[in-house]
C-alpha cells in the first residue's frame, strides 16, 4: 500500500461506516453531496438522495478528480487523528 493511502483509507472508511454526509469538491469546482457507499484505490461511490425526484442515485467519482472531501461533522473513529490539543496549565508565574 502506498504511503499516501495510509491516511486516506481510514478516513474514507470512517465516513462510510458512520454514514456521515459529505461534500466532495471536484477539481473543476463542482460540489457533490451524499454518503460514501464504498471506495477503492481509484474511485469513490457516492450515494445521494434527490428530494425533488424522490429517488436515490449512486455516482462513481474518480479520485484523481477530487479536490476536497468535507464531512458534515467530526469523524470519531479515524485512528490517525491526534488527540485534541490541551491548553498549557497555568503554573502561577
UniProtKB/Swiss-Prot annotation:
Residues covered by region (Disordered): 73-93
UniProt GO BP: regulation of DNA-templated transcription; regulation of RNA stability; regulation of translation, ncRNA-mediated
Disulfide bonds: none
Pfam families with a match to the protein in the record: Hfq (PF17209)
One GO cellular component, as annotated: cytosol
Listed Gene3D superfamilies: 2.30.30.100
InterPro entries attached to this UniProt entry: Hfq, LSM_dom_sf, Sm
Keyword vocabulary terms for this entry: RNA-binding, Stress response
Signal peptide extent: none
Taxonomic superkingdom: Bacteria
Molecular function as annotated in GO: RNA binding
Domain Sm residue range list: 9-75
Task performed by this protein: RNA chaperone that binds small regulatory RNA (sRNAs) and mRNAs to facilitate mRNA translational regulation in response to envelope stress, environmental stress and changes in metabolite concentrations. Also binds with high specificity to tRNAs.
UniProt xrefs under HAMAP family: Hfq (MF_00436)
Entry's family note: Belongs to the Hfq family.
Quaternary structure note: Homohexamer.
Protein name from the UniProt record: RNA-binding protein Hfq
Organism field: Hamiltonella defensa subsp. Acyrthosiphon pisum (strain 5AT)
Gene: hfq
